[in-house]
Every structure is written in structure tokens, then in C-alpha cells.
């Protein structure tokens, strides 16, 4: 995307104990990790989740599923081209997706009214494979191949958008880190949408549920690790949802609606690798649980001054 190897993006290291900010490159992250650190990654694979749908009058819109359950989706309806403006649907109308799939509009989701409750005739995975494309926003002006939205360790497909904190890891870098004593464990959390395509609405930081899984092998590795380094806020949400009062992780398959904000006790995660997002994004709510406000704002001022890039193809931050 940027003419760089994925592990050559910039890396900002925020040391909370020393209140120090260091600028580096992602492939040098091993210099800031320790022997026996455990990287916990989200192995969910990104779906080509942006689907064309046809209304009864023949117009085409795009459906972006946020929460997928058997028989129904909570989804955004937008115009099919940038800037992907929201489209108002009518309760009772039926959308056609491909040749055989239909989606009947039941109405708006009460707690997140920009999402539409769709009663779907199929799970939509075949339609995504045949017709879908990765969800993108106006800062990505042209369609991008799905491979660019995948982490190298991605496994089972299910995320509406890429768990992007892991994108800078290459196979070579992961191998080098393992050789220096840094371990890895995989959990799974299927992401929803990062934006509802309405700045004022996004600023209200509406929360929705996401499906996550932590198996016994991952739970044991996490519980034994001297330092747990979460690769992404999705991993933080999963681990903190699964953590008992003493911080121990138990195997789980469940939905989580956990909100993590300033003052939320962090019981299972010791350090965090994350992408950079605009200072108004809900992403920063979670970071405030890790980093005191003055240091976090200084880090973001540094990022702006040094022209760090935002979003899923941008630069990275390590909080230790």
C-alpha cells in the first residue's frame, strides 16, 4: 500500500514507567520486548464484507454487516462509492444480494439507530466470496485487494474489518522474535465496524457486541506468561472479558460488550501494540485505561509532529 514492507512502518514506543517516548521502526520491536514475553494475537481473518445489494426500485447500495447472528444481521447501509454516505432504508422492504440471498429490513437497531436489523435468508459467506470487497473508507480512494487486509497469521474468517494492529508483523519478524525467546498465543475476536460513517454519531462511541474465543491452550500460555503483550485493542477486549478477578484467563466462547475506558482496571494485559487513530476516535478511550492522559496526549502530539500515519495501513505504537 505505501511501497513499504509491512514490518517497515514506523513504531512509537511509549514507556509509562519512564514517561519516555522513543521513535523506531516496527521490525526493530524486538529491542523493546523481553525474553519470555507473550504476544497475544487475534487470528480472525478479514471478510470481503462490503456487499452490493439491490433495492426494489433497482438502485444498488452497499451493505456493511457489523454484527452477524444466525438469521439476522445488524448492518450499515451506504452508497456504493466514496464517500459512502448513509442510506435510509424502509422497514419491510426486501433487498436482494446476489442471485439467491435476500435481506428483509426489520427496522433500526434501537441502541445504534444507524444500524439496520436485516432478516437474512443465508449466512452470506458465499455471497461475500463471490461479490464482496473489503470495507474501506474515503481515505482509501480505490479498492484494495483483500490480501492487503489480512494479517500473516490470520486463520478463520469472520471479521468485518481487519484487526489491524497485527498487520506490521511479517513471517520473518515473528520468526526472529521467537528465536529471541518471545512467545505467541492466538485468540479470536471477530471485529465489527470501526465507523458508522457519521462523525457526530461516531463521537458518541456507540458500543456493540463482538464474538470471541479463547481456547485452553491459549489460556494456559497467557496465565503462565511473565508479561502479556496484546496485539491490538481487540485482544485487550477479549482478554479482559475473559479475565477473572485475579487476572486469570479461562477458556471461553461468547459475545462481549465490554467497554474499556479511563479508570477501567486492566487485569490480564501488561503491554499493548496498537495502530494509530485520530484523537477523537473511540480507540483512545481504551488507551486511556493504559496510559495517563498527559503522556497519551504527548504521544499523539509527537505522532502529529512527526507525521505518523493513521488507520489500518498506518504506523504503530507499543505501550510498555
Regions found by a protein language model. Name each.
Residues 1-320:
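A cross-family signal for N-terminal binding/gating loops and helix N-caps
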Amino acid at each position: 500500500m505505501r511501497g513499504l514492507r509491512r514490518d517497515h512502518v514506523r513504531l512509537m514506543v511509549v514507556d509509562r514507567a519512564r514517561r519516555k517516548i522513543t521513535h523506531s521502526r516496527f521490525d526493530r520491536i524486538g529491542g523493546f520486548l523481553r525474553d519470555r514475553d507473550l504476544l497475544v494475537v487475534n487470528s480472525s481473518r478479514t471478510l470481503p464484507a462490503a456487499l452490493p445489494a439491490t433495492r426494489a426500485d433497482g438502485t444498488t447500495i452497499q451493505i456493511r454487516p457489523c454484527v452477524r447472528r444466525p438469521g439476522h444481521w445488524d448492518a450499515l447501509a451506504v452508497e456504493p462509492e466514496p464517500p459512502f454516505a448513509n442510506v435510509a432504508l424502509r422497514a419491510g422492504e426486501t433487498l436482494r444480494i446476489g442471485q439467491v440471498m435476500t435481506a428483509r429490513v426489520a427496522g433500526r437497531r434501537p441502541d445504534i439507530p444507524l444500524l439496520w436489523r436485516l432478516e437474512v435468508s443465508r449466512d452470506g459467506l458465499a455471497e461475500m466470496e463471490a461479490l464482496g470487497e473489503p470495507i474501506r473508507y474515503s481515505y482509501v480512494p480505490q479498492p484494495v485487494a483483500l490480501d492487503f487486509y489480512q494479517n500473516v497469521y490470520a486463520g478463520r474468517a469472520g471479521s468485518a474489518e481487519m484487526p489491524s494492529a497485527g498487520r506490521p508483523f511479517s513471517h520473518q519478524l515473528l520468526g526472529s522474535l521467537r528465536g529471541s525467546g518471545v512467545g505467541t498465543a492466538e485468540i479470536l475476536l471477530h471485529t465489527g465496524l470501526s465507523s458508522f460513517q457519521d462523525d457526530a454519531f461516531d463521537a458518541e462511541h456507540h458500543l456493540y457486541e463482538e464474538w470471541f474465543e479463547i481456547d485452553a491452550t491459549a489460556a494456559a500460555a497467557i496465565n503462565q506468561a511473565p508479561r502479556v503483550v496484546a496485539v491490538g485493542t481487540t485482544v485487550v477486549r477479549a482478554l479482559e472479558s475473559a479475565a477473572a478477578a485475579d487476572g486469570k484467563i479461562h477458556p471461553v466462547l461468547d459475545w462481549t460488550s465490554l467497554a474499556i475506558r479511563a479508570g477501567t482496571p486492566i487485569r490480564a494485559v501488561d503491554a499493548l501494540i496498537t495502530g494509530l487513530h485520530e484523537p477523537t476516535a473511540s480507540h483512545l478511550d481504551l488507551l486511556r485505561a493504559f496510559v495517563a492522559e498527559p503522556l497519551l496526549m504527548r504521544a499523539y502530539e509527537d505522532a502529529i509532529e512527526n507525521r505518523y500515519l493513521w488507520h489500518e495501513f498506518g504506523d504503530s505504537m507499543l505501550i510498555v
